[in-house]
């Protein structure tokens, strides 16, 4: 059964799809030992955790980094690196998705990033054009758009096909000359369906529209390249495949677009050179309380103030986790996980569950449907067997990661059967 997020936060102490992108060759991990990486995480013996897409465990190396940061914070030592320096989270994340650090802003969550993009594009009324999304997009983003629809915005939701995909031709039928934005998930939270994001972007750009992608199930889980895809905006939290924690995420905004959109928020993080004038330095003439210059960067457009957890802990945690991911190699992470996914796709349907993940998906999740599965004996079996997967009312999602091996999959299958 799935652990509730509030329980995860208590346990951790509250520390703060596309073919062109999936063809990166794997390289040998820098860190010794290969896969699985069981010794890198504090997963208790006898417990099988197959729920990384819900919340990924934090590596030991990152926990150690947070402890050191806490010691520095207790003695009021300043952060070791200024934001933007080599090795900081923005730099590491930008490298991960082939962006510039100046195209990355911190946000509190994926939802916060999506909201900021919609606000920056001025989308909330019937006269603002239309937004196209699909039924496999993140449910929180769909909720946001449906609420805007109540206010008059033209929102068009493309239905999944019978084989649980989004057909590009269905998207094409929904897009027209008034489309301002296409919103999709690069890999669906529900079943791991992966858009051909390059095709989606080509479609949008041909109509003068932008593309926002929720990449929370791509970043860190599969090779992802914002330049190869052509995506205009993308956002993700860090508590899943980036092995971070709640309260901090990343928003990517294409550099060339920053002059075309409006700032949705204002705050002191956007103007690092800001200075206040107080006696005895009051200027002559008209009184100006502060002097500042807003940055023409993603941070200068979308950031406003300190995030949950503060820079001391978040920077330490994400720097360690993103460095760890870089050393292992995302393509290697994906290559290790894929045989586990294929085994699940082969065996679970034999137990009476319907597969809803496309057979060719290379994402980190595999989902199976069964009516009222949440009310069957399956959750009880899994809980008794100390196996953790995501179970909803009518579906079950399994998401192995780098600490899992085929023995974990066999154990899950044994408990399930």
Features from the language model and the residues they span:
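Residues within the helices of the helix-turn-helix
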Residues: 6
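N-terminal secretory signal peptides
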Residues: 1-3
